[in-house]
């Protein structure tokens, strides 16, 4: 049987646009998917828009958010090394994966939505009947994806992600105004 190959995409953005607050990947949103894929023997590739080091949101490392599995991965030097050396989306753009997974964290809000390489990767995989999945803020990477027929991928679909209400609970409404996103008018 063919080994499944999964592309996990993480943010490369470590600061909110105001330059006052750190952000990045929400660790548990990668750790749990990574662990699940690893246990199943999948070939895992981790990429970010520009490649290189993945900033991890310091809030996701706090005790109240760091579950046992996430802590195990955070303490694993091999996993941390993978996060320091992600491939760029350009490096993986010609490959076909069985699944693309967009991890969350506020950083994704700033380098996923308008990334044309990411949009093409998602379009190509979706149109080849491959799994395209996203969690939390990672769903913003789906917003501007146009399919070959010119329609937005999210048109007439239900998408669940981090809500505006939750941004308020997290105290991030001012930092994440959503006004920087180019939301397609026909995708709502």
Q: What do the PLM-derived regions correspond to, one by one?
A:
Residues 44-50:
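A short beta-strand-loop structural module common to alpha/beta enzyme folds
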Residues 99-104, 118-145:
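Catalytic nucleophile loop
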Residues 107-116:
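Glycine/threonine-rich flexible loop motifs
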């Amino acid at each position: 049987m063919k080994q499944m190959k999964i592309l996990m995409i993480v943010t490369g953005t470590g600061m909110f646009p105001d330059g006052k607050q750190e952000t990045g990947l929400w660790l548990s949103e990668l750790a749990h998917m990574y662990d699940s894929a690893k246990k199943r023997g999948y070939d895992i590739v981790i990429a970010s828009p520009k490649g290189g080091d993945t900033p991890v949101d310091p809030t996701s490392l706090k005790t109240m958010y760091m579950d046992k599995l996430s802590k195990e991965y955070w303490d694993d030097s091999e996993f941390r090394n993978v996060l320091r050396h992600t491939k760029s989306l350009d490096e993986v753009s010609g490959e076909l994966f069985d699944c693309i997974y967009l991890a969350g964290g506020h950083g994704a809000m700033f380098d996923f939505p308008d990334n044309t390489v990411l949009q093409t990767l998602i379009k190509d995989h979706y149109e080849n009947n491959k799994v395209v999945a996203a969690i939390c803020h990672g769903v913003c990477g789906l917003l501007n994806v146009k399919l070959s027929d010119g329609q937005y991928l999210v048109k007439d679909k239900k998408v669940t992600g981090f809500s505006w209400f939750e941004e308020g609970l997290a105290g991030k409404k001012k930092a994440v105004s959503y006004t920087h996103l180019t939301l397609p008018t026909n995708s709502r």
